[in-house]
Amino acid sequence: MKTLLLTLVVVTIVCLDLGYTLTCLICPERYCQKVHTCRGEEKLCVKRFYDEKALGWRAKRGCAATCPEAKPKETVECCSTDKCNK
């Protein structure tokens, strides 16, 4: 009986862990509310700030498997919790 209970606990923990999917914000607006469910390999939320000459500083948000390297005149922030790229 103890073995069965232990097996059920282990299976439950594994299934819960495999079922988790990160959610990130994906809109360019300053006060973003649009949520996107990331793919399994995407474990980070990203926010990139860049200078768009006519419009000023803009932000691009989304999901990523790895934190991208910043380009010239760009700032990149990565985080790993739901909707952390505000």
Swiss-Prot record:
Please list the tissues where expression of this protein has been recorded.
Expressed by the venom gland.
Q: Which PROSITE patterns match?
A: SNAKE_TOXIN (PS00272)
Position of the signal peptide: 1-21
Principal localisation: secreted
- UniProt entry keywords in alphabetical sequence: Acetylcholine receptor inhibiting toxin, Disulfide bond, Ion channel impairing toxin, Neurotoxin, Postsynaptic neurotoxin, Secreted, Signal, Toxin
**InterPro entries according to UniProt:** Snake_3FTx, Snake_toxin-like_sf, Snake_toxin_con_site, Toxin_cobra-type
Q: Which domain of life is it from?
A: Eukaryota
S-S bonds: 24-45, 27-32, 38-63, 67-78, 79-84
Which cellular component, as a GO term, is one annotated location? extracellular region
What is the annotated localization of this protein?
Secreted
A GO molecular function assigned to this protein is:
toxin activity
Q: Family membership, please give it.
A: Belongs to the three-finger toxin family. Ancestral subfamily. Orphan group II sub-subfamily.
Which function does this protein serve?
Binds with low affinity to muscular (alpha-1-beta-1-delta-epsilon/CHRNA1-CHRNB1-CHRND-CHRNE) and very low affinity to neuronal (alpha-7/CHRNA7) nicotinic acetylcholine receptor (nAChR).
Q: What is this protein called?
A: Neurotoxin 3FTx-8a
